[in-house]
Amino acid sequence: MAVGAAAVTEVGDTASPVGSSGASGGAIASGSVARVGTAAAVTALCGYAVIYLAARNLAPNGFSVFGVFWGAFGLVTGAANGLLQETTREVRSLGYLDVSADGRRTHPLRVSGMVGLGSLVVIAGSSPLWSGRVFAEARWLSVALLSIGLAGFCLHATLLGMLAGTNRWTQYGALMVADAVIRVVVAAATFVIGWQLVGFIWATVAGSVAWLIMLMTSPPTRAAARLMTPGATATFLRGAAHSIIAAGASAILVMGFPVLLKLTSNELGAQGGVVILAVTLTRAPLLVPLTAMQGNLIAHFVDERTERIRALIAPAALIGGVGAVGMLAAGVVGPWIMRVAFGSEYQSSSALLAWLTAAAVAIAMLTLTGAAAVAAALHRAYSLGWVGATVGSGLLLLLPLSLETRTVVALLCGPLVGIGVHLVALARTDE
Protein backbone atom coordinates (compact mmCIF):
# COMPACT_ATOMS: atom_id res chain seq x y z
CA MET A 1 0.00 0.00 0.00
CA ALA A 2 1.23 3.52 -0.77
CA VAL A 3 0.70 6.48 1.47
CA GLY A 4 1.67 10.14 1.34
CA ALA A 5 2.72 12.46 4.13
CA ALA A 6 1.38 10.19 6.84
CA ALA A 7 4.26 7.82 6.15
CA VAL A 8 6.51 10.12 8.12
CA THR A 9 6.47 8.76 11.64
CA GLU A 10 7.72 9.77 15.01
CA VAL A 11 9.85 7.28 16.91
CA GLY A 12 7.29 4.98 18.42
CA ASP A 13 4.26 6.85 17.01
CA THR A 14 2.49 7.98 13.85
CA ALA A 15 1.97 11.65 13.18
CA SER A 16 1.59 14.18 10.47
CA PRO A 17 4.91 15.86 9.70
CA VAL A 18 3.50 19.26 9.02
CA GLY A 19 2.57 20.73 12.35
CA SER A 20 -0.59 22.71 12.64
CA SER A 21 -0.31 24.59 9.39
CA GLY A 22 -0.39 21.73 6.96
CA ALA A 23 1.99 20.89 4.22
CA SER A 24 0.73 23.26 1.71
CA GLY A 25 0.79 26.42 3.67
CA GLY A 26 3.33 28.56 5.36
CA ALA A 27 6.61 28.26 3.46
CA ILE A 28 6.57 31.87 2.26
CA ALA A 29 3.26 32.93 3.80
CA SER A 30 3.36 36.28 5.55
CA GLY A 31 3.27 34.75 9.02
CA SER A 32 6.15 32.34 8.52
CA VAL A 33 8.27 34.87 6.64
CA ALA A 34 7.65 37.46 9.37
CA ARG A 35 8.69 35.04 12.10
CA VAL A 36 11.81 33.83 10.33
CA GLY A 37 12.57 37.36 9.12
CA THR A 38 12.39 38.70 12.67
CA ALA A 39 14.65 35.90 13.87
CA ALA A 40 17.05 36.63 11.01
CA ALA A 41 17.15 40.32 11.96
CA VAL A 42 17.95 39.45 15.57
CA THR A 43 20.58 36.97 14.40
CA ALA A 44 22.16 39.61 12.16
CA LEU A 45 22.24 42.17 14.96
CA CYS A 46 23.84 39.65 17.29
CA GLY A 47 26.41 38.79 14.65
CA TYR A 48 27.19 42.46 14.15
CA ALA A 49 27.49 42.83 17.93
CA VAL A 50 30.09 40.05 18.14
CA ILE A 51 32.05 41.53 15.22
CA TYR A 52 31.81 45.01 16.74
CA LEU A 53 33.01 43.90 20.18
CA ALA A 54 35.89 41.94 18.65
CA ALA A 55 36.96 44.81 16.40
CA ARG A 56 36.81 47.31 19.27
CA ASN A 57 38.68 45.01 21.64
CA LEU A 58 41.33 43.79 19.19
CA ALA A 59 43.61 45.84 16.94
CA PRO A 60 43.37 45.12 13.18
CA ASN A 61 46.18 42.57 13.48
CA GLY A 62 44.34 40.71 16.24
CA PHE A 63 41.02 41.06 14.47
CA SER A 64 42.46 39.37 11.37
CA VAL A 65 43.37 36.35 13.56
CA PHE A 66 39.87 36.27 15.06
CA GLY A 67 38.36 36.78 11.60
CA VAL A 68 40.13 33.70 10.29
CA PHE A 69 38.73 31.53 13.13
CA TRP A 70 35.27 33.09 12.69
CA GLY A 71 35.55 32.26 8.99
CA ALA A 72 36.84 28.74 9.64
CA PHE A 73 33.89 27.96 11.90
CA GLY A 74 31.55 29.53 9.38
CA LEU A 75 33.10 27.37 6.68
CA VAL A 76 32.60 24.03 8.45
CA THR A 77 29.16 24.91 9.82
CA GLY A 78 28.18 26.23 6.42
CA ALA A 79 29.01 22.80 5.01
CA ALA A 80 26.93 21.24 7.78
CA ASN A 81 23.99 23.32 6.57
CA GLY A 82 23.76 20.73 3.81
CA LEU A 83 22.06 18.61 6.49
CA LEU A 84 19.48 21.38 6.96
CA GLN A 85 18.80 21.51 3.24
CA GLU A 86 18.48 17.77 2.71
CA THR A 87 16.38 17.27 5.84
CA THR A 88 14.02 20.07 4.80
CA ARG A 89 13.66 18.60 1.32
CA GLU A 90 13.12 15.03 2.58
CA VAL A 91 10.45 16.01 5.09
CA ARG A 92 8.75 18.59 2.90
CA SER A 93 8.64 16.40 -0.21
CA LEU A 94 6.64 13.70 1.54
CA GLY A 95 3.45 15.64 0.98
CA TYR A 96 3.92 15.10 -2.75
CA LEU A 97 5.32 11.56 -2.88
CA ASP A 98 3.97 8.04 -2.49
CA VAL A 99 6.14 5.87 -0.30
CA SER A 100 5.95 2.29 0.84
CA ALA A 101 4.20 1.94 4.18
CA ASP A 102 6.39 -1.00 5.20
CA GLY A 103 9.70 0.41 3.98
CA ARG A 104 12.75 1.31 6.01
CA ARG A 105 12.92 4.48 8.07
CA THR A 106 15.66 7.01 8.78
CA HIS A 107 15.92 9.12 11.92
CA PRO A 108 17.65 12.29 10.63
CA LEU A 109 18.72 13.57 14.05
CA ARG A 110 20.50 10.33 14.90
CA VAL A 111 22.19 10.24 11.51
CA SER A 112 23.39 13.82 11.99
CA GLY A 113 24.82 12.86 15.37
CA MET A 114 26.95 10.22 13.65
CA VAL A 115 27.98 12.71 10.98
CA GLY A 116 28.95 15.21 13.67
CA LEU A 117 31.05 12.66 15.55
CA GLY A 118 32.79 11.62 12.34
CA SER A 119 33.48 15.27 11.49
CA LEU A 120 35.00 15.84 14.92
CA VAL A 121 37.39 12.92 14.43
CA VAL A 122 38.38 14.03 10.92
CA ILE A 123 39.09 17.64 11.88
CA ALA A 124 40.97 16.80 15.07
CA GLY A 125 42.92 13.98 13.43
CA SER A 126 43.95 15.99 10.38
CA SER A 127 44.72 19.21 12.28
CA PRO A 128 48.52 18.70 12.46
CA LEU A 129 48.56 18.96 8.66
CA TRP A 130 46.83 22.33 8.29
CA SER A 131 46.20 24.10 11.61
CA GLY A 132 49.63 25.74 11.75
CA ARG A 133 48.98 27.45 8.42
CA VAL A 134 45.46 28.63 9.34
CA PHE A 135 45.59 29.54 13.04
CA ALA A 136 48.34 32.01 13.87
CA GLU A 137 47.51 32.04 17.61
CA ALA A 138 45.71 29.74 20.10
CA ARG A 139 46.23 26.92 17.62
CA TRP A 140 45.16 23.86 19.60
CA LEU A 141 42.30 25.60 21.40
CA SER A 142 41.06 26.67 17.98
CA VAL A 143 41.23 23.08 16.70
CA ALA A 144 39.42 21.71 19.75
CA LEU A 145 36.61 24.27 19.65
CA LEU A 146 36.27 23.97 15.88
CA SER A 147 35.85 20.19 16.15
CA ILE A 148 33.43 20.16 19.08
CA GLY A 149 31.46 23.13 17.80
CA LEU A 150 30.94 21.46 14.42
CA ALA A 151 29.72 18.24 16.03
CA GLY A 152 27.06 20.21 17.90
CA PHE A 153 26.12 22.24 14.85
CA CYS A 154 25.39 19.11 12.79
CA LEU A 155 22.53 18.39 15.21
CA HIS A 156 21.55 22.07 15.19
CA ALA A 157 21.28 22.17 11.37
CA THR A 158 19.31 18.94 11.12
CA LEU A 159 16.86 20.07 13.77
CA LEU A 160 16.35 23.31 11.83
CA GLY A 161 15.60 21.26 8.73
CA MET A 162 13.02 19.15 10.56
CA LEU A 163 11.34 22.26 11.93
CA ALA A 164 11.28 23.88 8.48
CA GLY A 165 9.92 20.76 6.83
CA THR A 166 7.05 20.58 9.32
CA ASN A 167 6.10 24.29 9.27
CA ARG A 168 7.21 24.87 12.86
CA TRP A 169 8.50 28.33 12.01
CA THR A 170 8.20 29.76 15.53
CA GLN A 171 10.54 27.10 16.89
CA TYR A 172 12.76 27.45 13.81
CA GLY A 173 13.23 31.14 14.55
CA ALA A 174 13.68 30.52 18.27
CA LEU A 175 16.51 28.08 17.60
CA MET A 176 18.24 30.63 15.36
CA VAL A 177 17.90 33.36 17.98
CA ALA A 178 19.10 31.12 20.81
CA ASP A 179 22.30 30.37 18.90
CA ALA A 180 22.94 34.06 18.18
CA VAL A 181 22.12 35.32 21.68
CA ILE A 182 24.44 32.79 23.34
CA ARG A 183 27.27 33.99 21.11
CA VAL A 184 26.76 37.66 21.88
CA VAL A 185 26.45 37.01 25.64
CA VAL A 186 29.83 35.26 25.68
CA ALA A 187 31.35 38.00 23.51
CA ALA A 188 30.02 40.72 25.82
CA ALA A 189 31.42 38.92 28.85
CA THR A 190 34.76 38.64 27.05
CA PHE A 191 34.74 42.37 26.30
CA VAL A 192 33.99 43.27 29.93
CA ILE A 193 36.36 40.77 31.53
CA GLY A 194 39.16 41.39 29.05
CA TRP A 195 39.54 37.81 27.86
CA GLN A 196 40.83 39.09 24.51
CA LEU A 197 41.23 36.73 21.54
CA VAL A 198 40.57 33.49 23.44
CA GLY A 199 37.21 34.73 24.68
CA PHE A 200 36.04 35.70 21.20
CA ILE A 201 37.05 32.26 19.91
CA TRP A 202 34.84 30.72 22.62
CA ALA A 203 32.02 33.11 21.70
CA THR A 204 32.16 31.98 18.08
CA VAL A 205 31.24 28.38 18.92
CA ALA A 206 29.15 28.89 22.07
CA GLY A 207 25.82 28.82 20.22
CA SER A 208 26.37 25.21 19.17
CA VAL A 209 24.53 24.07 22.31
CA ALA A 210 21.33 25.93 21.36
CA TRP A 211 19.73 22.81 19.84
CA LEU A 212 20.01 21.02 23.19
CA ILE A 213 18.40 23.92 25.04
CA MET A 214 15.51 23.91 22.57
CA LEU A 215 14.98 20.17 22.99
CA MET A 216 14.89 20.60 26.76
CA THR A 217 12.44 23.51 26.78
CA SER A 218 10.17 23.14 23.71
CA PRO A 219 7.63 20.27 23.32
CA PRO A 220 6.98 21.08 19.60
CA THR A 221 10.72 20.90 18.97
CA ARG A 222 10.92 17.53 20.69
CA ALA A 223 8.01 16.33 18.53
CA ALA A 224 9.85 17.37 15.37
CA ALA A 225 13.07 15.77 16.60
CA ARG A 226 11.33 12.39 16.91
CA LEU A 227 10.24 12.31 13.27
CA MET A 228 11.47 9.56 10.97
CA THR A 229 11.47 9.68 7.17
CA PRO A 230 11.02 6.77 4.74
CA GLY A 231 14.12 5.32 3.12
CA ALA A 232 17.42 3.85 4.19
CA THR A 233 20.09 5.81 6.01
CA ALA A 234 22.40 5.37 3.01
CA THR A 235 19.85 7.08 0.76
CA PHE A 236 19.59 10.04 3.12
CA LEU A 237 23.37 10.27 3.37
CA ARG A 238 23.83 10.22 -0.41
CA GLY A 239 21.52 13.18 -0.82
CA ALA A 240 23.08 14.92 2.17
CA ALA A 241 26.59 14.34 0.80
CA HIS A 242 25.84 16.34 -2.36
CA SER A 243 24.26 19.09 -0.28
CA ILE A 244 27.19 19.12 2.16
CA ILE A 245 29.74 19.36 -0.67
CA ALA A 246 27.86 22.23 -2.25
CA ALA A 247 27.17 23.90 1.10
CA GLY A 248 30.85 23.57 1.95
CA ALA A 249 31.78 25.27 -1.31
CA SER A 250 29.22 28.00 -0.62
CA ALA A 251 30.55 28.39 2.91
CA ILE A 252 34.01 29.15 1.56
CA LEU A 253 32.57 32.17 -0.23
CA VAL A 254 29.97 33.16 2.35
CA MET A 255 31.64 32.56 5.72
CA GLY A 256 35.02 30.98 5.09
CA PHE A 257 36.34 33.63 2.73
CA PRO A 258 38.87 34.94 5.31
CA VAL A 259 40.42 31.46 5.32
CA LEU A 260 40.62 31.44 1.52
CA LEU A 261 42.11 34.92 1.62
CA LYS A 262 44.68 33.79 4.18
CA LEU A 263 45.66 30.75 2.11
CA THR A 264 46.18 32.87 -1.03
CA SER A 265 48.12 35.66 0.70
CA ASN A 266 51.57 35.71 2.21
CA GLU A 267 50.53 37.96 5.07
CA LEU A 268 47.20 39.63 5.83
CA GLY A 269 48.28 42.01 8.59
CA ALA A 270 46.32 45.15 9.38
CA GLN A 271 45.19 45.60 5.77
CA GLY A 272 43.73 42.11 5.81
CA GLY A 273 41.81 42.90 8.98
CA VAL A 274 40.23 45.94 7.31
CA VAL A 275 39.29 43.95 4.18
CA ILE A 276 37.81 41.08 6.23
CA LEU A 277 35.73 43.53 8.25
CA ALA A 278 34.56 45.30 5.08
CA VAL A 279 33.53 42.00 3.47
CA THR A 280 31.66 40.96 6.62
CA LEU A 281 29.79 44.25 6.99
CA THR A 282 28.73 44.57 3.35
CA ARG A 283 27.41 41.04 2.91
CA ALA A 284 25.65 40.46 6.25
CA PRO A 285 22.50 42.55 5.50
CA LEU A 286 21.75 40.31 2.51
CA LEU A 287 23.27 36.94 3.30
CA VAL A 288 22.34 36.56 6.97
CA PRO A 289 18.57 36.78 6.40
CA LEU A 290 18.82 34.84 3.12
CA THR A 291 20.75 32.03 4.78
CA ALA A 292 18.30 32.05 7.68
CA MET A 293 15.41 31.63 5.25
CA GLN A 294 16.88 28.62 3.43
CA GLY A 295 14.15 26.47 4.92
CA ASN A 296 11.45 28.82 3.64
CA LEU A 297 13.00 29.02 0.18
CA ILE A 298 13.45 25.28 -0.27
CA ALA A 299 9.92 24.62 0.95
CA HIS A 300 8.64 27.32 -1.45
CA PHE A 301 10.46 25.85 -4.44
CA VAL A 302 9.24 22.35 -3.58
CA ASP A 303 5.68 23.70 -3.54
CA GLU A 304 6.27 25.47 -6.90
CA ARG A 305 7.93 22.43 -8.46
CA THR A 306 6.12 22.80 -11.83
CA GLU A 307 7.46 26.33 -12.54
CA ARG A 308 10.80 26.63 -10.80
CA ILE A 309 12.33 29.31 -13.03
CA ARG A 310 9.27 31.54 -12.68
CA ALA A 311 9.34 31.00 -8.91
CA LEU A 312 12.82 32.58 -8.86
CA ILE A 313 11.70 35.92 -10.29
CA ALA A 314 10.11 37.54 -7.23
CA PRO A 315 12.86 36.70 -4.70
CA ALA A 316 15.56 37.61 -7.26
CA ALA A 317 13.94 41.00 -7.84
CA LEU A 318 13.80 41.61 -4.11
CA ILE A 319 17.48 40.72 -3.71
CA GLY A 320 18.42 42.99 -6.61
CA GLY A 321 16.45 45.92 -5.20
CA VAL A 322 17.88 45.56 -1.72
CA GLY A 323 21.35 45.18 -3.20
CA ALA A 324 21.06 48.38 -5.25
CA VAL A 325 20.06 50.36 -2.17
CA GLY A 326 22.86 48.69 -0.23
CA MET A 327 25.48 49.64 -2.83
CA LEU A 328 24.44 53.28 -2.66
CA ALA A 329 24.43 53.30 1.14
CA ALA A 330 27.79 51.52 1.35
CA GLY A 331 29.41 54.02 -0.99
CA VAL A 332 27.97 57.11 0.70
CA VAL A 333 28.12 56.35 4.42
CA GLY A 334 30.11 53.10 4.62
CA PRO A 335 33.59 54.58 5.25
CA TRP A 336 32.19 56.94 7.89
CA ILE A 337 30.41 54.08 9.68
CA MET A 338 33.59 52.01 9.76
CA ARG A 339 35.64 54.86 11.22
CA VAL A 340 33.05 55.86 13.83
CA ALA A 341 31.96 52.36 14.85
CA PHE A 342 35.29 50.54 14.79
CA GLY A 343 37.95 53.22 15.12
CA SER A 344 40.24 55.27 12.93
CA GLU A 345 42.45 52.25 12.21
CA TYR A 346 39.68 50.79 10.02
CA GLN A 347 39.95 53.00 6.92
CA SER A 348 38.17 51.86 3.75
CA SER A 349 37.23 53.59 0.48
CA SER A 350 33.69 54.18 -0.78
CA ALA A 351 34.43 52.30 -4.00
CA LEU A 352 35.63 49.19 -2.16
CA LEU A 353 32.52 49.03 0.04
CA ALA A 354 30.15 49.60 -2.89
CA TRP A 355 31.80 46.90 -5.02
CA LEU A 356 31.86 44.45 -2.11
CA THR A 357 28.11 45.03 -1.72
CA ALA A 358 27.66 44.22 -5.41
CA ALA A 359 29.65 41.04 -4.83
CA ALA A 360 27.31 40.18 -1.96
CA VAL A 361 24.37 40.47 -4.38
CA ALA A 362 26.06 37.97 -6.72
CA ILE A 363 26.54 35.47 -3.88
CA ALA A 364 22.95 36.05 -2.74
CA MET A 365 21.68 35.22 -6.24
CA LEU A 366 23.80 32.06 -6.25
CA THR A 367 22.33 31.11 -2.87
CA LEU A 368 18.84 31.60 -4.28
CA THR A 369 19.39 29.48 -7.40
CA GLY A 370 21.07 26.87 -5.22
CA ALA A 371 17.99 26.60 -3.00
CA ALA A 372 15.87 26.04 -6.10
CA ALA A 373 18.24 23.30 -7.27
CA VAL A 374 18.08 21.53 -3.90
CA ALA A 375 14.28 21.67 -3.95
CA ALA A 376 14.31 20.05 -7.40
CA ALA A 377 16.62 17.29 -6.10
CA LEU A 378 19.27 18.45 -8.59
CA HIS A 379 22.02 17.57 -6.14
CA ARG A 380 24.74 17.16 -8.74
CA ALA A 381 24.02 20.49 -10.43
CA TYR A 382 23.71 22.18 -7.05
CA SER A 383 27.11 20.98 -5.87
CA LEU A 384 28.74 21.57 -9.27
CA GLY A 385 27.49 25.15 -9.32
CA TRP A 386 28.87 26.00 -5.91
CA VAL A 387 32.14 24.16 -6.44
CA GLY A 388 32.59 25.92 -9.78
CA ALA A 389 31.94 29.30 -8.17
CA THR A 390 34.40 28.59 -5.37
CA VAL A 391 37.14 27.32 -7.67
CA GLY A 392 36.63 30.34 -9.89
CA SER A 393 36.90 32.72 -6.95
CA GLY A 394 39.97 30.93 -5.62
CA LEU A 395 41.74 31.20 -8.97
CA LEU A 396 40.85 34.88 -9.27
CA LEU A 397 42.39 35.50 -5.85
CA LEU A 398 45.72 34.42 -7.32
CA LEU A 399 45.74 37.32 -9.80
CA PRO A 400 48.69 39.74 -9.36
CA LEU A 401 46.47 42.56 -8.10
CA SER A 402 46.14 44.48 -4.85
CA LEU A 403 44.40 42.71 -1.96
CA GLU A 404 41.28 44.90 -2.29
CA THR A 405 40.99 44.52 -6.07
CA ARG A 406 41.40 40.75 -6.22
CA THR A 407 38.95 40.36 -3.34
CA VAL A 408 36.27 42.25 -5.27
CA VAL A 409 37.00 40.45 -8.56
CA ALA A 410 36.91 37.03 -6.89
CA LEU A 411 33.68 37.62 -4.98
CA LEU A 412 31.89 39.31 -7.87
CA CYS A 413 32.85 37.08 -10.82
CA GLY A 414 33.20 33.63 -9.26
CA PRO A 415 29.49 33.27 -8.34
CA LEU A 416 28.44 33.91 -11.96
CA VAL A 417 29.76 30.47 -12.88
CA GLY A 418 27.54 28.75 -10.33
CA ILE A 419 24.46 30.81 -11.21
CA GLY A 420 24.81 29.71 -14.83
CA VAL A 421 25.10 26.03 -13.87
CA HIS A 422 22.02 26.17 -11.64
CA LEU A 423 19.86 28.02 -14.16
CA VAL A 424 20.71 25.63 -16.99
CA ALA A 425 19.81 22.62 -14.83
CA LEU A 426 16.57 24.21 -13.61
CA ALA A 427 15.54 25.20 -17.14
CA ARG A 428 15.90 21.58 -18.26
CA THR A 429 13.56 20.36 -15.51
CA ASP A 430 10.90 22.89 -16.59
CA GLU A 431 10.94 21.74 -20.23
UniProtKB/Swiss-Prot annotation:
InterPro entries: Poly_Biosynth_Transport. Its main location: membrane. Keywords: Cell membrane, Membrane, Transmembrane, Transmembrane helix. The chain crosses the membrane at residues 33-53, 63-83, 111-131, 143-163, 175-195, 197-217, 241-261, 273-293, 318-338, 358-378, 381-401, 407-427. The keyword Transmembrane applies. It is found in: Cell membrane. GO terms for cellular component: extracellular region; plasma membrane. It is a multi-pass membrane protein. The keyword Cell membrane applies. To M.tuberculosis Rv1510 and M.bovis Mb3654. This is Uncharacterized protein Rv3630.
